């Protein structure tokens, strides 16, 4: 099963690469803006190093925990007991992917964010770092032990940010430390983590959010579940909403789900980045667009064919 799935992904990547366009092949203003300000944006923010330090510590953590898997499971192991570093290595979005999520939030300024699949909380921290204190950020995690680790990571991130900020001051007093901590707390939204099976928690969370400006869906890689999440969230979207589906080439089922989602009547633009798919509902886009993109440095040569 593992080799079969990896072969499928390799075949799909070859097709993706051949059809993918770079910033030099796009003229549509909406998509070009996405490329310049999101996909090709390599600006570094001080918070990134703090979050990546947490990722590094997770990759060294050998403690084992027993998991409850509500999703499609892992393609690397089927055991219920897994080490934290195994989870970090296989389940966390990469450094680049997380920075990309940060860019999405930073560019489009969503005020109601939903994440399906908290995992160890690293991607959540990037979403949080790009948000202001008026943003509502809800993240759903099925496994209580993983949720506990995520909460601990968020606390550690807060402490590291405090240390980083205080290091820039001479003669730190208790009052100054308290003032800085209050500023940090006010600058980013509270992360609301909801534990439990998405079948039970998604509806409740959507009712609390009332609208979804941005959703990052990375919790279940089955066709039926993905389509159900899409239709549930769709009822809470507006013209400015953005939905991101992770691992669209994880399996034939996920690719099937992605193809149906991007061709839904309400979608005005879809972008395929291979590792994820993004759909927009922007009514200012008069002609439906389906675009496959890749960073220019990853495709310096232009192929003369596609399929």
Residue ranges and their predicted role:
Residues 1-214, 221-242, 249-307:
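A short alpha-helical cap/connector motif
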């Amino acid at each position: 099963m593992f080799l079969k799935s990896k072969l499928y992904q390799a075949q799909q990547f070859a097709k993706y690469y051949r059809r993918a366009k770079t910033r030099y092949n796009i003229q549509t203003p909406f998509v070009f803006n996405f490329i310049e300000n999101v996909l090709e944006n390599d600006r570094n923010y001080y918070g990134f190093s703090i979050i990546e330090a947490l990722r590094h510590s997770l990759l060294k953590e050998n403690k084992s925990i027993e998991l409850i898997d509500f999703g499609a499971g892992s393609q690397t192991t089927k055991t219920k007991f897994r080490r934290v570093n195994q989870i970090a290595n296989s389940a966390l979005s990469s450094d680049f992917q997380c920075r990309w999520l940060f860019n999405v939030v930073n560019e489009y300024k969503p005020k109601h964010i939903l994440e399906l699949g908290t995992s160890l909380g690293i991607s959540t921290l990037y979403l949080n770092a790009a948000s202001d204190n008026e943003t509502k950020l809800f993240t759903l995690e099925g496994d209580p032990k993983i949720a506990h680790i995520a909460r601990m990571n968020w606390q550690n991130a807060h402490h590291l940010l405090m240390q980083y900020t205080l290091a820039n001051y001479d003669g730190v007093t208790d009052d100054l430390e308290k003032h800085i901590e209050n500023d940090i707390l006010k600058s980013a939204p509270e992360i609301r983590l909801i534990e439990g099976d998405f079948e039970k928690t998604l509806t409740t969370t959507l009712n609390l959010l009332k609208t979804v400006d941005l959703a990052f869906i990375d919790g279940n890689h089955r066709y039926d579940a993905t389509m159900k999440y899409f239709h549930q969230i769709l009822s809470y979207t507006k013209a400015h909403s953005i939905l991101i589906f992770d691992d669209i080439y994880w399996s034939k089922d996920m690719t099937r789900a992605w193809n149906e989602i991007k061709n839904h009547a309400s979608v005005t633009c879809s972008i395929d980045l291979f590792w994820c798919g993004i759909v927009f509902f922007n009514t200012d886009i008069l002609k439906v667009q389906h675009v496959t993109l890749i960073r220019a440095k990853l495709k310096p040569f232009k192929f003369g064919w596609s399929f």
